From Swiss-Prot:
GO molecular function: flavin adenine dinucleotide binding; tRNA (uracil(54)-C5)-methyltransferase activity, 5,10-methylenetetrahydrofolate-dependent
Pfam (any one): GIDA
Keyword Acyltransferase: no
GO cellular-component term (any): cytosol
One annotated GO biological process: tRNA wobble uridine modification
Residues binding FAD: G7, G8, G9, L10, A11, G12
Cofactor requirement: FAD
PANTHER family tied to this protein: GLUCOSE INHIBITED DIVISION PROTEIN A, METHYLENETETRAHYDROFOLATE--TRNA-(URACIL-5-)-METHYLTRANSFERASE TRMFO
SUPFAM superfamilies xrefs: FAD/NAD(P)-binding domain (SSF51905)
Family affiliation: Belongs to the MnmG family. TrmFO subfamily.
Enzyme Commission number(s): 2.1.1.74
Species in which this protein is naturally found: Coprothermobacter proteolyticus (strain ATCC 35245 / DSM 5265 / OCM 4 / BT)
Protein name from the UniProt record: Methylenetetrahydrofolate--tRNA-(uracil-5-)-methyltransferase TrmFO
Gene assigned in the entry: trmFO
Length: 432
């Protein structure tokens, strides 16, 4: 019997490849293009709908540690991400289109995977399944899972940022450079104090799309706040947040620089640039109007505009193996479990895939050590209470504290996590 994988996002694609590589036949269901979501623009598998950055490459950063652990465990999508990597300072930034194409090709060409383009509304209870529908799930499947799991969905709002054709930006008002280091991965558009305050005022007065659907501040995910929400917290909030000029070597021709708008390459050729940290729910007409009043963007052509979309997840439905508490054949993966972030979604798909393979192969399910970053995340998700309303991305608070001098704790924590995940990889038979 084939293992069903529901959802062709990051988690579902990773789960399908993990199982298929282990010799299990997989049927991967993806509802696009027949049924699209508010955030997706294509029918490709593993489409990146927000940023094109998978997180930090820094060894002492929580994302960087998770990335290391996924490489140790043999993640297919992480390997493909490095194939699609473009400049990104200390982050794993990928060519959005190339990455999705590589994943699509890997999945469709695998002899053990059958891709079915159809919407699934219910799941037979005796079918081994990895449920990875993503946070944009709604309708019949959501209601089916709520009923079977005895849990109610949690809701929050996420946002995407605009992208611009690079050749339409006036370079007389911009410069390339990275914060705190060499390189030129980011295009920086400096704003004077006067321009900055004007810009903030425009954001505060702009008309928003469907504001009545998300009029409570706590409905937004804190790590992906729209710029207009940040601006409401204080006039200088953006200047000390995503628009901070700190660490940039600013050319002399730019005077009185109070803030910067940063853009990052979205593809390898650099023909499209994405605004960094500029998620917004302002109406599309107002976005174009506001940005085009800044000299650098007066002739800008926007290939994508920011928007807000509603996300959902089911807290408290899985154990430490991402296995359903109500059906031992069902496993969950991705943001629908309550994780947040691209890498976290990939991690969920990998972990669920490993455990389904072990279950069907008659092997004992082995828990991850809590000292590892992935183990800490899995433990948090397992212990999440039904009333949890916000998803969780990786951070060092998920792992147990370490003893010793403060100056030594950071490295001790990293060393301990790496020893733990390498031990787990051997136990799970994931050593390559």
């Amino acid at each position: 019997m084939d293992v069903w994988v529901i959802g062709g996002g990051l988690a579902g694609s990773e789960a399908a490849l993990t199982l298929a590589d282990l010799g299990f036949p997989v049927t991967l269901f993806e509802m696009r293009p027949a049924v699209m979501t508010p955030a997706h623009k294509t029918s490709k598998l593993a489409e990146l709908v927000c940023s094109n950055s998978l997180g930090s490459l820094s060894t002492d950063n929580a994302k960087g540690e998770l990335l290391f652990e996924l490489k140790v465990l043999g993640s297919s999508l992480v390997n493909l991400a490095f194939e699609a990597q473009i400049g990104g300072d200390k982050a794993l930034v990928v060519d959005r289109e190339l990455f999705s194409t590589l994943v699509e090709d890997a999945v469709r060409s695998h002899r053990n995977i059958t891709v079915v383009r159809a919407e699934i509304t219910e799941i037979p209870k005796d079918v081994p399944c990895i449920i990875a529908p993503g946070p944009l799930i709604k309708g019949d499947l959501l209601h089916f899972l709520e009923e079977r799991e005895g849990r109610c969905e949690a809701q929050y709002y996420d946002a995407t940022s605009p992208s611009i054709l690079s050749e339409t930006i006036d370079m007389d008002y911009a410069f390339w450079g990275n914060r705190f280091g060499e390189g030129s991965d980011y295009l920086n558009v400096p704003l004077s104090k006067e321009e900055y305050y004007w810009f903030v005022e425009q954001l505060l007065n702009a008309r928003e799309a469907h504001r009545h659907d998300f009029d409570k501040p706590d409905a937004f995910f804190e790590r992906c706040l729209p710029v207009e929400e940040i601006a409401r917290r204080g006039k200088e909030s953006l200047a000390f947040g995503p628009m901070r000029p700190t660490g940039l070597a600013i050319p002399e021709k730019f005077r009185d620089v109070h803030a910067v708008i940063q853009l990052r390459k979205e593809n390898a050729s650099g023909t499209i640039l994405n605004m960094v940290g500029f998620q917004t729910g302002i109406s599309h007409t107002e976005q174009i109007s506001i940005f085009k009043q800044l000299p650098a963007f007066k002739n800008a052509v926007f290939v994508r505009l920011g928007q807000i979309h509603q996300n959902r997840f089911l807290p408290g439905v899985v154990n430490k193996f991402f296995q359903s508490r109500t059906n031992r054949l069902w496993f969950y993966a991705g943001q629908f479990t309550g994780t947040e972030g691209y890498l976290e979604a990939i991690a969920g798909g990998l972990w669920a895939g490993i455990n389904v393979a072990r279950l069907l192969g008659g092997e004992k399910l082995i828990p991850l050590p809590e000292e590892s970053m992935l183990g800490g995340l899995v433990t948090y998700i397992e212990q999440s209470l039904p009333e949890v309303k916000q998803p969780m991305g990786v951070n060092w608070g998920l792992v147990p504290p370490v003893e010793g001098k403060k100056s030594e704790r950071k490295q001790k924590r990293v060393d301990r996590a790496r020893i733990a995940i390498e031990y787990a990889a051997r136990e799970l038979g994931r050593v390559t």
